[in-house]
């Protein structure tokens, strides 16, 4: 009986860690990656960025009220 409780607790901890990684950790890493590379990427890397946004979209929605990276102002050369 005690072994079942320990096993269930370990499984619960594993699920919580995976959910935390999916909803909080990986989207934060993707946000930081997008912020640093957005203006200098190639077309293939941009497709990879869109894939990451699609993959971690639920976590992006969780973090979006707290992280707001605005675009840089464009320098217009005359």
From Swiss-Prot:
Name of the protein this chain belongs to: NAD(P)H-quinone oxidoreductase subunit L
Keyword Lipid biosynthesis on entry: no
Function noted in UniProt: NDH-1 shuttles electrons from an unknown electron donor, via FMN and iron-sulfur (Fe-S) centers, to quinones in the respiratory and/or the photosynthetic chain. The immediate electron acceptor for the enzyme in this species is believed to be plastoquinone. Couples the redox reaction to proton translocation, and thus conserves the redox energy in a proton gradient. Cyanobacterial NDH-1 also plays a role in inorganic carbon-concentration.
EC number: 7.1.1.-
Gene Ontology cellular-component annotations: plasma membrane-derived thylakoid membrane
Segments passing through the bilayer: 10-30, 47-67
Family statement: Belongs to the complex I NdhL subunit family.
Subunit structure of this chain's protein: NDH-1 can be composed of about 15 different subunits; different subcomplexes with different compositions have been identified which probably have different functions.
Cell compartment(s), UniProt: Cellular thylakoid membrane
Superkingdom of origin: Bacteria
Matches recorded under InterPro entries: NADH-quinone_OxRdatse_su_L
GO MF annotation: an example: quinone binding
Keywords on record: Membrane, NAD, NADP, Plastoquinone, Quinone, Thylakoid, Translocase, Transmembrane, Transmembrane helix, Transport
Primary location group: membrane
Catalytic reactions of this protein: a plastoquinone + NADH + (n+1) H(+)(in) = a plastoquinol + NAD(+) + n H(+)(out); a plastoquinone + NADPH + (n+1) H(+)(in) = a plastoquinol + NADP(+) + n H(+)(out)
Disulfide-bonded cysteines: none
Membrane-topology descriptor: Multi-pass membrane protein
Pfam families: NdhL
